[in-house]
Amino acid sequence: MSFLKNIFPTPKNSNSQTQEIIVDMHSHLLFALDDGASTLEDSLSLLEEFQALGYKKLITTPHIMGDFFKNTPETIFPKLELLKKVLKEKNIALELEAAAEYYLDEWFIEKLNRNEKLLTFGNNYVLFELSYINSSVYIDEAIFMLKSQGYNPVLAHPERYIFWHGNTQALQEIYNKGVILQVNINSLVGYYNKGAQKMAEQLIDLGIVKMLGSDCHGIRHIDALKKARKTKHYKKALPNLINNTLLS
């Protein structure tokens, strides 16, 4: 499908396809915005951990969820600029950007209906998530509207949605519609549950995982991340990933 080539860019050289991930595109590192880092000190500690793991760029994605996390550019970007300033003062060589992780519900559909500008990263990518328990009645509508408005949708952690466990065909169909599937690295060590681990491995085996993300909320996720980056399926996923094309 030729249209997928525009969404899933080929890495600039063959080496970049198989090297370690140096760009993370899903995390909750901006303090006091959601259920991630609580303080500036927490944010800095996590950034230092990522640097020690060899990351060069972090695209952090605070939750935007109508009933719980009502973040906006006005709440997100001042925290981003403050953190970038502190990184510079401390000579921490990390590139830091911010987008968002949108929760797919009626509130999000209303944003799309208003043609409200969404927070994006890279090639106009929009990260969105679903309920872990129940499939969303809005998913086909959201995909259509996002693409119609020029966005490239990225589905966060599809392996964690229990209603899809054992049904890789459903996710293959979503992928075929031009949706990027982003698996959480920590799923590869069963951090969330064994069902999520199995699904993550199956999606990687199918070759339809284009992004791996840390989904880091705190130091507990860093500890699991260190183990997950040594797994067979982490290494198997690397050649198909586009994470490192996000390095500016």
State what each model feature region is:
Residues 51, 147, 204-205:
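Non-catalytic positions within long, well-ordered alpha-helices that form the structural scaffold/packing
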Residues 3-4, 10, 226-248:
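Mid-to-C-terminal alpha-helical segments outside catalytic/metal-binding sites
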Residues 65-68, 103-105, 160-164, 188-191, ...:
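Active-site environment of divalent metal-dependent phosphoester hydrolases
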Residues 2, 70-177:
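Extended substrate/RNA-proximal surfaces in nucleic-acid metabolism proteins
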Residues 23-27, 58-60, 96-100, 126-128, ...:
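Hydrophobic faces of well-ordered beta-strands that scaffold small-molecule active sites
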Residues 1-92:
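An N-terminally biased module of ancient metal coordination in phosphate/nucleic-acid-related enzymes
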Residues 178-190:
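His/Asp/Glu-enriched short active-site or ligand-binding loop at hydrolase and phosphoryl-transfer sites
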Residues 208-224:
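Short acidic/histidine-rich active-site segments
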